[in-house]
A protein has these predicted regions:
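Short, well-ordered beta-strand segments enriched in hydrophobic/aromatic residues
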Residues: 1-5
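Short, acidic/polar linear motifs in exposed loop/turn regions
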Residues: 6-9, 146
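Anionic group-transfer/hydrolysis microenvironments
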Residues: 7, 20, 121
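Active-site/ligand-binding surface loops and adjacent short beta/alpha elements
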Residues: 10-92
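Beta-strand-rich recognition/accessory modules
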Residues: 61-147
Length: 147
């Protein structure tokens, strides 16, 4: 993703590379690579330092501003998906959970169980400030490996 400021003033931009990853069952996944990193829960506004492996429970909207690589472990499909980002971007974890998913017109009521998002982002305090004529890039790669 590349953003260029074509105007005469600096602009502030938040961006994310969204991934809707298919998983065997959201109740049987975990995310590693977050240990010891500061994060924020967008649902509650709570800030925290993460300890251990992340296991989602219910609705998940968590941002880790200083995490540029992480791994999703899918225990049903016996695989891991590695996210790697460049440019010092953050990591956002998202799943709507059952209640929020039921309100989405474009998702089946139990579809949240078969997907999870692990995304590369620049948002909040880490949003880009792009000067006139400047271009900023966000790059992300995903790779799948047996586990």
């Amino acid at each position: 993703l590349a953003c260029t400021s074509l105007g005469s003033k600096a602009v502030r931009i938040e961006c994310a590379l969204h991934t809707y990853l298919a998983v065997g069952d959201v109740d049987h996944i975990s995310v590693s690579g977050l240990q010891g990193h500061e994060g924020e829960d967008f649902a509650s506004g709570e800030k925290f330092v993460w300890r251990g492996e992340f296991v989602p429970s219910g609705e998940c909207r968590k941002r880790f501003p200083r995490v540029s690589s992480a791994e999703l472990h899918d225990k049903v499909w016996h695989r891991k998906i590695r996210l790697e980002s460049t440019c010092g971007s953050g990591c956002f974890l998202w799943n709507p959970g059952s209640e929020r998913c039921a309100g989405f017109a474009d998702m089946e009521k139990d579809e949240y169980r078969r997907m999870f998002c692990i995304e590369s982002t620049f948002a909040g305090d880490d949003a880009w400030r792009i000067k006139p004529g400047e271009t900023r890039q966000l790059k992300m790669s995903l790779s799948e490996h047996p586990e």
